Amino acid sequence: MTLAKEIARDLLKIKAVYLKPEEPFTWASGIQSPIYTDNRVTLAYPETRTLIEDGFVEKIRAEFPDVEVIAGTATAGIPHGAIIADKMNLPFAYIRSKPKDHGAGNQIEGRVAPGQKMVVIEDLISTGGSVLDAIAAAKREGADVIGAAAIFTYELPKADKNFNDAGVKLVTLSNYTELIHLAEQEGYINAEGLALLKRFKEDQENWHL
């Protein structure tokens, strides 16, 4: 079984991902969605957590061999990023969504040298907006951001466009396509549910029952 399928299986098993194609969720953006993901749940399961962090290390070493510092997005990317940095014996920093309004006004916590090659860790990619904002902040501080890595992606076309426009390489451990097919194979959804989930991937903005 591939890493993407292993992680998809674990996300379903521990209920980090909920699939309700016939009772959709409403995202903050207003989009009706048949899927909801909370990857923070993975931190409570040591075997899943280890699978994820080892997967990150393998992917980062393969795709970004020159990395010099790992950074996590606040807050979801912090625990994963810290574990990855420890496993890779690299410095760690984290990036706030906005600068502090007191003290030194830092947006990046930790020490990042100008030109230091950075990979930014996020737990979930929807449109990619939050991680790309974090990357922009890191670049303003002088970091050389060579890529981003995430546990899971919804594979939204808008995310692909946003990362391409920003010139940022993204790698993920698992994805929507792998997960919905595995979910159907293992009985989480039926064939009709799978068809609804496939339709969502084709046109998220206009998807409805």
Swiss-Prot record:
Binding positions (5-phospho-alpha-D-ribose 1-diphosphate): R96, K100, H102, E122, D123, L124, I125, S126, T127, G128, G129, S130
Names of the cofactor(s): Mg(2+)
Catalysed transformations (reactions): orotidine 5'-phosphate + diphosphate = orotate + 5-phospho-alpha-D-ribose 1-diphosphate
EC category name: transferase
SUPFAM superfamilies in UniProt: PRTase-like
Highest taxon in the source lineage: Bacteria
Any one GO molecular-function label of the UniProt entry: orotate phosphoribosyltransferase activity
Listed Pfam families: Pribosyltran (PF00156)
GO biological process, one term: 'de novo' UMP biosynthetic process
Key words, A-Z: Glycosyltransferase, Magnesium, Pyrimidine biosynthesis, Transferase
E.C. no: 2.4.2.10
Pathway: Pyrimidine metabolism; UMP biosynthesis via de novo pathway; UMP from orotate: step 1/2
Positions that bind orotate: S126
InterPro entries recorded: OPRT, Or_phspho_trans_dom, PRibTrfase_dom, PRTase-like
Its biological purpose: Catalyzes the transfer of a ribosyl phosphate group from 5-phosphoribose 1-diphosphate to orotate, leading to the formation of orotidine monophosphate (OMP).
Assembly, per entry: Homodimer.
Matching HAMAP family: PyrE
Record NCBIfam families: pyrE
Family under the similarity heading: Belongs to the purine/pyrimidine phosphoribosyltransferase family. PyrE subfamily.
Protein name: Orotate phosphoribosyltransferase
Gene, per the UniProt record: pyrE
